[in-house]
């Protein structure tokens, strides 16, 4: 008898409180990098009814109007109506940013490898901004080489935002969540969607019947291929019956609380570090991107159907302390060969990653909602498949 299993992932919209915080943090990062590409930034944000607090550590000579960046970001998301309890022009903005600790800066600005070494490699100059472990993942379930549950979850909330911003569904408000359960067969291949959960904020006059029908017809059926839906697929749409109060009025939000949404929906392991508000010297962010870059190129090269890459670092040290690749029995070559090839082809020192992926640019605000990985709507360097041939050659 064949054994089938279920796996579930979720996503949240750009109007979710935690995602508002992520987007503000990354908008501040982008604004600083646009003026000072060498800046070190760790910007955290907290949002709640009528108030935004921005705090953290920054080293830069650039001036950025934090108040304006915060308000513009909130307006772009769609919080422009005071009835929402959180509005771009009326919210209180409270910045509290200080300079990066000199104890941390000395290890980032001069890595262990170059201290007292006159013949230094410029890419050894930057040490990791902290210790930690980071994961990257890819699987051949979708065109973008992402797990199907998180890919569909992201597309559902993005579709809701499109319908809200275009005015096609006029009663929608910015806050929303999605969740998709996919059934896998005995070969670990997705065969159908078992359950879809969507909760979307709405104006008080919208009826449950109207919301239910619109979400099924204009969101679910537009996003999920019909081949994955059948008469046993379950839909739970606004299952509480009412979702008028939402966003920061309904729940406080913090930067870095949606790290599973940001990555692989729980399908792969996670090192625990968040991304938003951090410049690329923070390996929580840059090494996670590098690990995805490696994993995606491995799968695209046909060297595995599924690949997970772990990188680990010591603070103030440029070279990773470990590189581990797991192909879960799907690899066509030994994992040790892939690890050796990855070290040869991908420069995994922080400065090497920054150069390889061109990470000093203001590109981060666009990643802070709807996932950092598997994006086909924007051009992200860690999603490129330009190392496929090099990997194939390296493992011959």
UniProtKB/Swiss-Prot annotation:
Pfam families: S-AdoMet_synt_C, S-AdoMet_synt_M, S-AdoMet_synt_N. It is found in: Cytoplasm. CDD domains: S-AdoMet_synt. Its cofactor is Mg(2+); K(+). Residues 100-110 are annotated as: Flexible loop. ATP binds at residues 16, 175-177, 242-243, 251, 257-258, 274, 278. It comes from the Bacteria. Pathway: Amino-acid biosynthesis; S-adenosyl-L-methionine biosynthesis; S-adenosyl-L-methionine from L-methionine: step 1/1. It is an enzyme of class 2 (transferase). GO terms for cellular component: cytoplasm. One of its GO terms (molecular function) is ATP binding. It catalyses: L-methionine + ATP + H2O = S-adenosyl-L-methionine + phosphate + diphosphate. L-methionine binds at residues 57, 100, 251, 282. Its EC number is 2.5.1.6. Keywords: ATP-binding, Cytoplasm, Magnesium, Metal-binding, Nucleotide-binding, One-carbon metabolism, Potassium, Transferase. Homotetramer; dimer of dimers. Catalyzes the formation of S-adenosylmethionine (AdoMet) from methionine and ATP. The overall synthetic reaction is composed of two sequential steps, AdoMet formation and the subsequent tripolyphosphate hydrolysis which occurs prior to release of AdoMet from the enzyme. Belongs to the AdoMet synthase family. This is S-adenosylmethionine synthase.
């Amino acid at each position: 008898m064949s054994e089938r299993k279920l796996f579930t992932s979720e996503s949240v919209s750009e109007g979710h409180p935690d995602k508002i915080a992520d987007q503000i943090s990354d908008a501040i990062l982008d604004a600083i990098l646009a003026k000072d590409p060498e800046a070190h930034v760790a910007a955290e944000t907290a949002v709640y009814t009528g108030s935004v607090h921005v705090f953290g550590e920054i080293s830069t000579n650039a001036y950025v109007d934090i108040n304006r960046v915060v308000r513009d970001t909130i307006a772009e998301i769609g919080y422009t109506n005071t009835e929402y309890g959180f509005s771009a022009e009326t919210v209180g903005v409270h910045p509290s940013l200080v300079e990066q600790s000199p104890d941390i800066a000395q290890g980032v600005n001069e890595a262990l490898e170059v201290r007292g070494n006159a013949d230094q490699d410029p890419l050894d100059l930057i040490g990791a901004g902290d210790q930690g472990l980071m994961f990257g993942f890819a699987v051949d379930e979708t065109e973008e080489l992402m797990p199907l549950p998180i890919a569909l979850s992201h597309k559902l909330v993005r579709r809701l935002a499109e319908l809200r911003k275009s005015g096609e569904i006029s009663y929608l408000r910015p806050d929303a969540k999605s969740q998709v359960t996919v059934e896998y067969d005995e070969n670990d291949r997705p065969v159908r969607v078992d359950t879809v959960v969507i909760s979307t904020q709405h104006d008080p006059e919208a009826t449950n019947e109207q919301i239910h029908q619109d979400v099924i017809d204009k969101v679910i059926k537009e996003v999920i291929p019909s081949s994955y839906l059948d008469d046993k697929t379950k839909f739970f749409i606004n299952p509480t019956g009412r979702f008028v109060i939402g966003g920061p009025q309904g729940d406080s939000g913090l930067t870095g609380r949606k790290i599973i949404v940001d990555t692989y929906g729980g399908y792969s392991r996670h090192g625990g570090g968040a991304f938003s508000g951090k410049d690329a010297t923070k390996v929580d962010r840059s090494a996670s991107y590098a690990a995805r870059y490696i994993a995606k190129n491995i799968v695209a090269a046909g060297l595995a159907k599924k690949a997970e890459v772990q990188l680990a670092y010591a603070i103030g040290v440029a070279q990773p302390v470990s590189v581990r690749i797991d192909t879960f029995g799907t690899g066509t070559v030994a994992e040790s060969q892939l690890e050796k090839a990855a070290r040869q082809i991908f420069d995994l020192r922080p400065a090497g990653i920054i150069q390889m992926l061109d990470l000093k640019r203001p590109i981060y605000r666009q990643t802070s909602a709807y996932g950092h990985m598997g994006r086909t709507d924007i051009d992200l360097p860690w999603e490129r498949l330009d190392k496929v041939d090099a990997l194939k050659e390296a493992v011959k």
